């Protein structure tokens, strides 16, 4: 009975956010449809270009609902011990040979390690979760790169590549500009690592930012309630800053503000 009451409470907490996300997608689809109709009526050459993919689909609804469930049941809490999730180091040539790894870390090239292995006792660790098929995450990568360049002298940075947000065999997102990626749902760790490497080939991050992939059980994704994208700051093994659920509350500006308050403006 207690479990049923708990599930009901979680559902009631999720519903407002779920419906607001659905409303946003419905409005987005409507705007895109109107634009296409106007283009057709004006006989625009671009009217028939590209396939129109609706965002508000049954696959999309399931994905949105599951993302809210993941957020509701996340293990991570602000001010508490950071979950020490298993991750896999992504080999990326000179990136790893030129990266300074915190003393005492138990990190092996291409092998399984723990998220907190990348944290040093006196420096905060900025952890950015996302995937190549997540448009908001991709659009924020230049800002993340600037963060690394500005604060790598006082903080460490880690990019965790997770399950695809919009896989080609699932809830496909419309192409957003020239830097659009297409990956299917990862069938094995090799595919996930391959997707991570292709992302970094396109967005060259500074060598001070280390790159890992979530394990195939998605334990980091679950522990941190990521779903599609999330950012947090770990300091002395505790969560010093916990970003909101993406896409609407995923913000690197707040991370910059935290770092500036702690270490000064760059």
Swiss-Prot record:
GO MF: thyroxine 5'-deiodinase activity
Regulation: Not inhibited by N(6)-propylthiouracil.
Main location: endoplasmic reticulum
Location(s) in or outside the cell: Endoplasmic reticulum membrane
Lumenal compartment spans: 1-13
Enzyme active site: 134
Membrane topology term: Single-pass type III membrane protein
Topological region Cytoplasmic: 35-266
PANTHER family per UniProt: IODOTHYRONINE DEIODINASE, TYPE II IODOTHYRONINE DEIODINASE
Function (record text): Plays a crucial role in the metabolism of thyroid hormones (TH) and has specific roles in TH activation and inactivation by deiodination. Catalyzes the conversion of T4 (L-thyroxine/3,5,3',5'-tetraiodothyronine) to T3 (3,5,3'-triiodothyronine) and rT3 (3,3',5'-triiodothyronine) to T2 (3,3'-diiodothyronine) via outer-ring deiodination (ORD). Catalyzes the conversion 3',5'-T2 (3,5-diiodothyronine) to 3-T1 (3-monoiodothyronine) via ORD.
Family named by the database record: Belongs to the iodothyronine deiodinase family.
Entry protein name: Type II iodothyronine deiodinase
Lineage of the organism: Eukaryota, Metazoa, Chordata, Craniata, Vertebrata
Gene transcribed to yield this protein: dio2
């Amino acid at each position: 009975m207690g479990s049923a009451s708990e599930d009901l409470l979680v559902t009631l907490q999720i519903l407002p956010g779920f419906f607001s996300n659905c409303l946003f997608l419905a409005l987005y689809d409507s705007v895109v449809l109107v634009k296409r109709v106007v283009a057709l009526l004006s006989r625009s050459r671009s009217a028939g270009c590209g396939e129109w993919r609706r965002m508000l689909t049954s696959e999309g609804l399931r994905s949105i609902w599951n993302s809210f469930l993941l957020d509701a049941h996340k293990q991570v809490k602000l001010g508490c011990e950071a979950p020490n999730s298993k991750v896999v180091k992504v080999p990326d040539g000179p990136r790893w040979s030129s990266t300074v790894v915190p003393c005492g870390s138990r990190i092996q090239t291409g092998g399984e390690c723990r998220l907190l292995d990348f944290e040093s006792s006196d420096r905060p660790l900025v952890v950015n979760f996302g995937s190549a098929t997540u448009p908001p995450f991709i659009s924020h990568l230049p800002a993340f790169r600037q963060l690394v360049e500005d604060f790598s002298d006082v903080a460490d940075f880690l990019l965790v590549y997770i399950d695809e947000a919009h896989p080609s065999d699932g809830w496909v997102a419309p192409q957003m500009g020239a830097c659009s990626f297409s990956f299917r749902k990862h069938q094995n760790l090799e595919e996930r690592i391959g997707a991570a490497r292709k992302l970094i080939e396109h967005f060259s991050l500074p060598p001070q930012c280390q790159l890992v992939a979530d394990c195939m059980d998605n334990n980091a994704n679950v522990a941190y309630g990521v779903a599609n994208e999330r950012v947090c700051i770990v300091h002395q093994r505790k969560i010093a800053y916990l970003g909101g659920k993406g896409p609407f509350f995923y913000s690197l500006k707040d991370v910059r503000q935290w770092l500036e308050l702690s270490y000064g403006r760059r």
